Amino acid sequence: ASQKRPSQRHGSKYLATASTMDHARHGFLPRHRDTGILDSIGRFFSSDRGAPKRGSGKDHAARTTHYGSLPQKSGHRPQDENPVVHFFKNIVTPRTPPPSQGKGRGTVLSRFSWGAEGQKPGFGYGGRAADYKSAHKGLKGADAQGTLSRLFKLGGRDSRSGSPMARR
């Protein structure tokens, strides 16, 4: 009996540690994902800002209270926030040079997007759609949906021979 008890205890301890480890792993996985997202956001804004953003709002609040209580750190606070504040100021309230850049980029982006939308999908797909519609009209197609359904029926009968696909 004395030999069985420690084995049972070890088994229960092992199960308990395994379950707690599983819980810890499950608890850490989403946290690591969130920190990864926050780190990526922090790196996007400023590499120095990534470390403070790892902590939750509580960390930030504690740091702000520390900054407020200690005058030395309050002097360092604007230095830490300078790049981010500068970045946001450039975005939110652009001064004389940024608006010209913003306008130029906006027009270029809009032209590029219009060109991409108009030429590649518009002409290419439009031409293809016209070809397909004309070919299907010759085959017996009236609407695009009818041609699509007939295409699926033909494809299902010929290649797959699947009854549900053919019925659709």
Curated annotation (Swiss-Prot):
Flavoprotein recorded as keyword: no
Disulphide bridges, residue numbers: none
Span list, region Induces experimental autoimmune encephalomyelitis (EAE): 45-86
Compartments, record wording: Myelin membrane
PTM annotation: As in other animals, several charge isomers may be produced as a result of optional post-translational modifications, such as phosphorylation of serine or threonine residues, deamidation of glutamine or asparagine residues, citrullination and methylation of arginine residues. Phosphorylated by TAOK2, VRK2, MAPK11, MAPK12, MAPK14 and MINK1.
Post-translational modification Symmetric dimethylarginine, affected residues: 105
Location of Citrulline modifications: 25, 31, 128, 157, 168
Deamidated glutamine: residues carrying this PTM: 101, 145
Domain of life, per lineage: Eukaryota
Membrane topology summary: Peripheral membrane protein
Presence of the UniProt keyword Acetylation in the record: yes
Chain positions of site Cleavage: 88-89, 112-113
Phosphothreonine PTM sites in chain numbering: 17, 20, 35, 65, 93, 96
Residue positions, PTM N-acetylalanine: 1
N6-acetyllysine carried by residues: 120
Keywords per UniProt: Acetylation, Autoimmune encephalomyelitis, Cell membrane, Citrullination, Membrane, Methylation, Phosphoprotein
Modified residues (Phosphoserine): 7, 12, 19, 40, 56, 74, 113, 159, 163
Subunit structure: Homodimer.
Family named by the database record: Belongs to the myelin basic protein family.
UniProt protein name: Myelin basic protein
Organism whose genome encodes this protein: Oryctolagus cuniculus (Rabbit)
Gene symbol of the encoding locus: MBP
